[in-house]
């Protein structure tokens, strides 16, 4: 068999396309040179992927073109794609160069740019795989210009989003870029904190996400990813400021949450809003700009599980973190109390946790007589409600990471009941709590409090957003109130309005 025939056969088997012969001739020439100049083993160890990576890092255009052609073909070939992507993933310099090639402007570099554009779709796929590893996320964030280029891929014109027959490769590049950014902003620990800030500090990030939300009705998958990214970013205080400061984002999230025909889409919007409102007066003010927002949230409380859960989360955070100037308006949420109390009586896990938490916030706007009246409206009496709270504490004898604030919210509500009870009603809830063994329960809880119960949310195992008052201090206050058996208005957990 002649050398040319052999090269043609290898090119066909490697699926190197029309430029296969040129690429292979250069490969074997370099392998031969390695054998002559060094050891024969140097030439034998060479492979096409490493060879191509070396070429795209070259300063010569013809070598760069050969390299990018080889990588493009190998990375799209069914037989070699997996191994090629795995090998490329260990060399950030190659990915950086491919990204850099997109910015080349000279006419003679047009083919390189075209190959690089196709290759970058694969590059985003590589980055997505790399981002599954915590250490790699840090490397992606530190690679010069790489994060900015990933964000650049999230920019998409309204025409493309509104066109159902738009190029699949264009849509896929936006999708993969959003997937990579989502993985970066959900990275745990100090690396994640730095990445969330880096993503937020890019002036194009939030405006690009806004464009997807605003025009992506035909691309719901992209909208979901955009909202996932916003939720992850909102775990950082400075990122929240950037999101709220970008016009129209909160308004779009509210519109999607209240009007989305697709449940999952509405759920993503609700999660983003709840995270934005957590410990952020500015975010709460932005949400309250919508005139009917409280009515809409109240009507969503008894919706299906996820929608009702997120409505409660948003409403609780609005009550807890809005400025004093919104107090009068927020007091209207008391009309939702029967629905919230009903969720406490029948709910489980997260629904139960947030319903009790919302109750503690609504109680800031009522006195004990009004609260008792709301119990009646919900078809309950004092004993049934207190028995439910006692039952929750007995069920959750130890803290649970799934519902880290469960016991905190219940003890806060118990403290409010005791603080608000008057001597005129003979001790009211205090006597009832004593009768049902609350002292023994609280003493047992005091022995099992955990640092887990001092935070709002977690990024992996890393806590985010610490409560102002420790849970152990709240338990101690409740025990003191129970022992005193008298009105101690203004003391303890009932006064922790923004816990």
Residue ranges and their predicted role:
Residues 37, 53-54, 99, 128, ...:
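Amphipathic alpha-helical repeat scaffolds
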Residues 41-46, 52, 88-105, 117, ...:
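Amphipathic alpha-helical segments within extended alpha-helical solenoids and repeat-rich scaffolds
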